[in-house]
Amino acid sequence: MKGILFFFFLLPLLSHPQTIDNHFKIDQIGYRPNDKKIAVISDPQTGYNAPDPYTPGATLELRRESDHVVVFSGAPVAWNSGATHAQSGDKAWWFDFSTVTTPDDYYINDPANNKRSY
């Protein structure tokens, strides 16, 4: 019995909940099944949000919200060879998950940084 109680007290310390992060820009309304689906990931360089940098990991995942199963994974691609966008002051990456055509609720997960989209 003591072992079971110890496990339940230890479990919250072992789990690492993912942080919902606003660096992922996705269509909040959704995508039609055969549409091009691209998320934009931003890394602020200048401006009000510059103190909140973010560089995505080498591989991002698209996960189904209901059971958190990975349905697609791929590498983010640097926008404009990694240049900073003059108007926004951000560097950006594109994450194309257009091959996913099954309607459902999904989120983008960055396992290297333990962050996810809304």
For every predicted segment, state its role.
Residues M1-T19:
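Bacterial Sec-dependent N-terminal signal peptides
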Residues I20, F24-Y118:
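Ligand-binding face of N-terminal immunoglobulin V-set domains in extracellular IgSF glycoproteins
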